[in-house]
Amino acid sequence: MARGSAVAWAALGPLLWGCALGLQGGMLYPQESPSRECKELDGLWSFRADFSDNRRRGFEEQWYRRPLWESGPTVDMPVPSSFNDISQDWRLRHFVGWVWYEREVILPERWTQDLRTRVVLRIGSAHSYAIVWVNGVDTLEHEGGYLPFEADISNLVQVGPLPSRLRITIAINNTLTPTTLPPGTIQYLTDTSKYPKGYFVQNTYFDFFNYAGLQRSVLLYTTPTTYIDDITVTTSVEQDSGLVNYQISVKGSNLFKLEVRLLDAENKVVANGTGTQGQLKVPGVSLWWPYLMHERPAYLYSLEVQLTAQTSLGPVSDFYTLPVGIRTVAVTKSQFLINGKPFYFHGVNKHEDADIRGKGFDWPLLVKDFNLLRWLGANAFRTSHYPYAEEVMQMCDRYGIVVIDECPGVGLALPQFFNNVSLHHHMQVMEEVVRRDKNHPAVVMWSVANEPASHLESAGYYLKMVIAHTKSLDPSRPVTFVSNSNYAADKGAPYVDVICLNSYYSWYHDYGHLELIQLQLATQFENWYKKYQKPIIQSEYGAETIAGFHQDPPLMFTEEYQKSLLEQYHLGLDQKRRKYVVGELIWNFADFMTEQSPTRVLGNKKGIFTRQRQPKSAAFLLRERYWKIANETRYPHSVAKSQCLENSLFT
């Protein structure tokens, strides 16, 4: 396979649609248990960007065959982080092509000597195309950032005498093309009076910086050779009882026994089961409720799965514990229901974005963001515009923050992006998203795209197929995409369960004219609802605001203008939110980095918080509104009386 093209995927050879190890089996979050161990590889890795003209030197010289430092200089690179903002090298910040990471690891002796132990290498995210070598052996490839992939490397570490070190080499290409998600194009600038020979730029069609690298944790973990591969849980409610339906996949042997226990928050066993599938009934159930919707939100049970099996080397056992929230989701023509009760999304859109670390996962930032969400009175957010780290989803389960889980289908702006290769890849990405996040009670809806060119006929077929595929993967949740098209021309809207609309009245349209917002917003809602008869979420609205800019009367880019724009939107939303508008998500939670342009001052400034998480004036306005909305319907019902409506769609 030819690899290492400067800017195009064509030289990579055929993409591995599902044949790579990283796309097989389950994707349970790694955890330690009596049968499992984890070894995190976060920290400093050796790093090199391939600045050669064709970006292929690393493959031509086979950098993966020996330690990276032997083939040239390396620098320290923290993992997890984006590589772009770590150094003072301007070339690296805007680099397009292959970068190389390497780390040497000493393994515990038991991992290499006990043949009943399976050793797995897991990469939380590598944006965007990754090739992995272990001790110079080509082990794994994966296309697409923002999602985990892994490989069983037991046969590489359990050979001969104990290897003193394990060398992991990862090459990552961040090039975006018409068949990647998100898509992009490469433009060669050939006027030699302005540009040197071979000069090119990466064009993107989305408004956030294309950070890249090992942006989430890398780790090794073990399981027995016969192991719990995957668990799928769906829940429902029957009078005052909760029903937990489970399916368990086991790999490595057909001779095994499974025991299942469901424990409540006090670690008391409330139900038992056996076998690979079954139903657990929980009398007097404590439901999983969103934040501010119940006096005890985010109630989680623990599903404990114990496997015992016979192998040729003797008996083995495996243990895995899955948090379970028992709740229902349903959609009617005018309501979004959680546990049979109307739910109103009052929340934010976010980005995984911060100073220095870029899109790199960071625990302090995560906790700070959730503290701000709760202070704000937000009960929901959309993972705009890609799946967030698994730790984020776990926090949502624990805190009761509802999630619209969006894939990286952003920037689908050109007709050539709606091709069969892209469609195949998009459907596979949705498989990976659902596989990873299907058991999170906080996830109540899938979003397959943001602002696609949904007025195109080709987009209509494309979206129809992706939505249908997602529904086949998970019939228990509604599916949407986020539109900014005209209601009469949108070819994808007939296939969604909930209409999600982005509009920027008085900003991108009729900018400066705050007095038009209420009329234009009312017209928008009425047109969409009359045509489609589906609940509507105002999925984006907002205004660019430079913290500390003030002007009265309000002028654009000032804090006063952002506040005034929000106030006008809120008046318009209040006219419809007791009818068929079921949510509002501000754009954006915090300022974030974008590509440089004459219209962006160090990034997008539509946040109600700065990039450093300090509030602008609008944050206090939004906090007052969200707490007011929450208090209108706060704790109006008991758990025992909460049931999903019989005529709802997703039970």
Swiss-Prot record:
It is an enzyme of class 3 (hydrolase). Its EC number is 3.2.1.31. GO terms for molecular function: beta-glucuronidase activity; carbohydrate binding; protein domain specific binding; signaling receptor binding. The keyword Signal applies. It catalyses: a beta-D-glucuronoside + H2O = D-glucuronate + an alcohol. Inhibited by L-aspartic acid. Plays an important role in the degradation of dermatan and keratan sulfates. Glycans are attached at N173, N272, N420, N631. This is Beta-glucuronidase. Belongs to the glycosyl hydrolase 2 family. Homotetramer. Residues 1-22 form the signal peptide. It comes from the Eukaryota.
